[in-house]
Amino acid sequence: MIKKIFLLFFILITSNISAQEIAVLQYGGGGDWYSNPTALPNLIQFCNDQINTTISRNPKVVKPNDVDLFDYPFVHMTGHGNVFFTQEEAKNLRDYLLSGGFLHIDDNYGMDQYLRKELVKIFPNKELIELPNNHVIFKEPFSFPQGLPKIHEHDNSRPQAYAIFNEGRLVLLYTFESDLGDGWENPEVHNDPQEVRLKALRMGANIIKYAFED
């Protein structure tokens, strides 16, 4: 019995050591960076179960000017309202992205008008480019022939996926008019049909896979 307990403890310890960590971005400006609290943990569980990732089940929280930012290969950002980066934060985010990091921004409806002007601080000489439906991020491991799926309807606008590239590498993905994070939340939060939640989780898995491998 003691041996079994020790073995279980050893497995838990080694699995935690080998697990990859990802983070949520705690930005300034008053926007609700903390919205969709069950979203990322659910996406992590889905990815670990379905595409064999080994991501730590509890995402961390990181600020734009934290040195720890560089510890995470994938950082997620969401919210409904205002976003603000200081020049120091913008530089740190730029350095992070140019050093191999990946930022996924999911507009939870209401962020767009604030976000776009702050992205200019990070990359003053780069523009958001809409991804075509045949981009690899919509192909692997799950196929989305029509591109970014629509998860929540707000104003009858089509879902759009925008990107910023550096030397051919996609470093920032901005999902707009889709609301992927709402689809990742616990079922009882939005009462989405299972097929809608599955679309959101599968698209999220594609993003995670792309961020980790490209």
Features from the language model and the residues they span:
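Aromatic-Pro/Gly-enriched surface loop or interdomain linker
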Residues: 18-74, 78-81, 171, 179-180, ...
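Sec-dependent N-terminal signal peptides
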Residues: 4-14
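Sec-exported extracytoplasmic/periplasmic mature domains
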Residues: 48-52, 98-101, 120-124, 212-213
